[in-house]
Curated annotation (Swiss-Prot):
Disulfide bonds: none annotated. This is C2 calcium-dependent domain-containing protein 4D. InterPro entries: C2_dom, C2_domain_sf, C2C4C/C2C4D. Residues 205-331 form the C2 domain. It comes from Mus musculus. Residues 56-71 have a biased composition (Basic and acidic residues). It holds the Pfam family C2. SUPFAM superfamilies: C2 domain (Calcium/lipid-binding domain, CaLB). Coiled coil: none annotated.
Length: 341
């Protein structure tokens, strides 16, 4: 106490200074019965506002002012799995009240659905898949559901149209468009072109090559597909040669452009699978009888090593052609008439 008195501290003086302070610094005790003051945005048990959803107003336009958003008359598929959210035009959307933008209005359904009367156009339509293989030639009338195997939900166009109406219907943005074909016509023709599978024996150490040949007389294109090689001999381990993998070299004799074509390299396999196509252009029908195919199978050298020959063969080109490719084949005459599918 003596030390505090020397420092100038007095107990009574400190209490007097505290009482003389600003009254806002000293909290006042509130009476128990007085209501508590708080922010009006804070919800308390005794202050719960009453939510009010205004009633739906009538549309001033009425039924006459409605605009048909689907002038083409087509039933468009709805991209929604909830039937109660499908509108009258067939689109899936959340209706909004014209007099409020509250979140509660998003859950209000259309009038027809609320009254229990579902509109005829609000049903979900799922169009059947288009199984047409190629595009049919254009015509004035669309295919009817009776003639189509799957039945199209689109309404058919009128069968009789004047020249003016036909021209305007084709250029209209709402004119029905045919769906793209499932398979292109070139893809189907490629499947219908005749091909021939051949097996070439390799010498002198054995093995064979499997080829598939196709010839198009129109552009004069020869396609050789190298499928695989079987029974290749083991590469001899010599210092400074081989060890890089197996590849095949194909060329036509006498040489034509492009010259020798090389396949990809398959590592460490006696039965490599290639599945590669080789094309030779500019081959006329008279040239097929005087040319031959020469194939070489090499063991590629790795780094500075040299290539090692595993086998080779040479076969007349006419023996590899399919029998239906313009009547060409062993023992057939080279006539200028050729079939090109």
């Amino acid at each position: 106490m003596w030390l505090l008195e020397k420092a100038g501290y007095r107990v009574r003086t400190a209490e007097a200074r505290a009482l003389q302070a600003h009254p806002s610094l000293v909290p006042k005790r509130q009476a128990r019965g007085s209501p508590s003051r708080c922010n009006p945005n804070v919800l308390t048990p005794d202050r719960i506002p009453q939510f009010f959803i205004p009633p739906r107003l009538r549309d001033p336009r009425g039924a006459e002012g409605r605009v048909d958003r689907n002038p083409g008359g087509r039933n468009l598929p709805v991209a929604c799995s909830l039937p109660h959210l499908a509108g009258r035009e067939g689109w899936a959307f959340l209706p909004e009240s014209p007099h409020t933008r509250r979140r509660e209005s998003l859950f209000h359904g259309p009038r027809g659905l609320a009254a229990g009367l579902a509109p005829a156009q609000s049903r979900l339509h799922v169009s059947a898949p288009d199984l047409r293989l190629c595009r049919a030639p254009d015509s004035d009338t669309a295919s009817s559901p009776d003639s189509s195997p799957c039945g199209s939900p689109h309404t058919p166009r009128p069968q009789s149209l004047s020249p003016d109406e036909a021209s305007s219907a084709d250029t209209s943005p709402y004119a029905p468009r045919r769906a793209p074909p499932l398979f292109h016509l070139d893809f189907l023709c490629c499947q219908l072109r005749p091909t021939k599978d051949s097996v070439l024996r390799l010498g002198p150490r054995g093995g064979q090559l499997r080829l598939s040949t196709e010839y198009q007389a129109g552009p004069g294109r020869l396609r050789l597909r190298l499928v695989s090689a079987e029974g290749l001999p083991r590469p001899r381990t010599r210092p400074g040669s081989g060890g890089g993998g197996c590849c095949v070299i194909l060329r036509l004799q006498p040489r034509v452009r492009p010259g020798a074509q090389r396949s990809r390299v398959v590592q460490s396999s006696c039965n490599p699978i290639f599945n590669e196509d080789f094309f030779f252009e500019g081959l006329r029908p008279p040239d097929l009888a005087v040319r031959s195919l020469r194939a070489k199978v090499l063991d590629r050298g790795a780094g500075l090593r040299r290539d090692v020959l595993l086998g080779e063969c040479e076969t007349p080109l006419i023996a590899l052609l399919p029998p239906l490719a313009g009547g060409l084949g062993p023992g057939s005459s080279l006539a200028p008439t050729h079939l090109s599918l």
